[in-house]
């Protein structure tokens, strides 16, 4: 029975890539810099303290993959762990360092074109675009129109939004158009309808995602995003390994978290909603228990990126990694004879780095299975090696990019 479980620790980079200079990210290292801060006692909080402790990830080869990427061991990680998995560090072939590019490349389809971006920090959006969106939505104005941190923009504009009913439009260094609205005063359904309008009006702009950012709370300092985020992505430019599994093998692909949104539902047969790392982990365990032949269970743990990476919260990121590590044996215990587990990431988001954007880094590729030979798989030239390996494993037609590493 062929089953594969892909767990994406969103933004968990393990060292800058050779092309990081083009992105302003030379020296970035999400794992290494978190470990450095922990070792120096600078990442203590109510949940954790001291050196970074990731014994189970280290057994799967995380510390070794990081060393092969950066030339050094991350302090606190076990350099002498008994390695039980195959490990690698992978560079990105895609032109960007964004979520869709990383995920699509993982599934065998790198993004070789350039996304459209709203590069102006202020007055970011063309007036003709926002005029069309407002007219179709029956709105008389909007707030924002800038690059912004997703939590700071709520403090800056949330109360005015509640008072006026005007949605908050903002963007970032990624190819995104984000809309924040209060779930209670504006309405979640209304926000999602507005995002669909924006998605349609952005057809000629080559923007990767429209993101609905619902929030709640009575006022500044008390606003909080809810778990009802939606990502409206464009479709991948060609068939991913997910689509090939479904179409060629009548297989199942179970999306947990925002996976379905990222792939614009292409190649997704089942969607499980869960919010927060504990609930995402529980949902993953449940779906592994239920999974049959020719099934991929695919989970994105978005909080590493959204709650800790972008927020530059080193202690929070470290605590979340340690929580994930403690629960990892629960997945390993469910593995059957022919199963494959792949732990990876889609880009970096170094919480010690200037700004609030992603970082261009190698991703870890940690592979475990009872029939997988442990040891180094070296440097992979593209995330698409994961997709090609899955295509070979499930016996689908091969992908155009990537090399099988098993």
UniProtKB/Swiss-Prot annotation:
Binds 2 manganese ions. Keywords: Cytoplasm, Isomerase, Manganese, Metal-binding. It is found in: Cytoplasm. It catalyses: 2-deoxy-alpha-D-ribose 1-phosphate = 2-deoxy-D-ribose 5-phosphate; alpha-D-ribose 1-phosphate = D-ribose 5-phosphate. Pfam families: Metalloenzyme (PF01676). GO terms for molecular function: magnesium ion binding; manganese ion binding; phosphopentomutase activity. One of its GO terms (cellular component) is cytosol. It is an enzyme of class 5 (isomerase). Its EC number is 5.4.2.7. Mn(2+) 2 binds at residues 305, 310, 358. Pathway: Carbohydrate degradation; 2-deoxy-D-ribose 1-phosphate degradation; D-glyceraldehyde 3-phosphate and acetaldehyde from 2-deoxy-alpha-D-ribose 1-phosphate: step 1/2. One of its GO terms (biological process) is metabolic compound salvage. Its cofactor is Mn(2+). Disulfide bonds: none annotated. Mn(2+) 1 binds at residues 10, 346-347. Its main location: cytoplasm. PANTHER family: PHOSPHOPENTOMUTASE. HAMAP family: Phosphopentomut. Belongs to the phosphopentomutase family. Isomerase that catalyzes the conversion of deoxy-ribose 1-phosphate (dRib-1-P) and ribose 1-phosphate (Rib-1-P) to deoxy-ribose 5-phosphate (dRib-5-P) and ribose 5-phosphate (Rib-5-P), respectively. This is Phosphopentomutase. It comes from Vibrio cholerae serotype O1 (strain ATCC 39315 / El Tor Inaba N16961).
